[in-house]
């Protein structure tokens, strides 16, 4: 990795500091502070910070604060906080709109090392505000003891349920009234929260009640009314029954894998099933490294990110505990794809869409949850419920 000793004076004393306590807010020249969540890559990023210190003389403090998003917004809004914040891309638009993030301009050769769709997640208003690290997506998790080959469509799952029901088991469960999960059906044939354009998202163009979205919602009604998915199924019911070996498939993500391994379930991950002729489409998240607009050390931040953290070697170190899952770096992902579950996670993201990273998504979540609840309970027809959701989003 490149060294900066020829350019930057070494610090007289420099140590790696990693803490879960309250973060320091003041910036210091020639010293980097990174805030990130504590659930992925914690050990690996500390190793990279150590290496950066050894090779450049620049201290890197890695902090894992509670309530990171609120604290970053407060600190950065007053010109303080970390130089680099690592978080899911969905907060990027809000922070960029508030002037809290710097645009980044990686070279074409650097960009080519990462999947194009992960760079799309790092865009706001057509400009790049972060570096993609890893990808998290829903998939169809299946119990190999109950199904040899994962079903390709919901039609196949409905047929499978007729057989499994005779044994007291189910073909599929998922938390249909939670928009993150239920939306996958509505997106299959063209539903969208806000229309994606080259310049970002057109918040006046809402597609939650278009023909494709209604088609997905009508399938959901059919699944519930035929008792393929029992009315009232939520995440805890799904997770509990799947871990007991009572369910052949569920729609969930990598966060469910550790519990399955503890339960001794022999599981696989596949593409989400088709709604008609089209795959159900997840909204995927991308863990992203962003640079604070208040940082006086943006040159150092780019050096650490591009030549250390996000190099192939750096990604391997960052992921030394295996917690990143699917990654945005093409060559390193090819290595990880020996694990078919990690490969399937990336494949689901490739057919899905990045979760829109704009503040208006709050209106989407708030409108879609009651809409899906009303569809699931039968209080409203799919068209009525989705029309109401669209009206609420426009308010």
Regions found by a protein language model. Name each.
Residues 31, 348-395:
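Conserved C-terminal helix/tail region of periplasmic/extracytoplasmic solute-binding proteins
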Residues 89-139, 149, 154-158, 185, ...:
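Hinge/lid segment of periplasmic solute-binding proteins
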Residues 161, 202-232:
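Glycine-centered hinge/linker elements that transmit conformational signals in sensory
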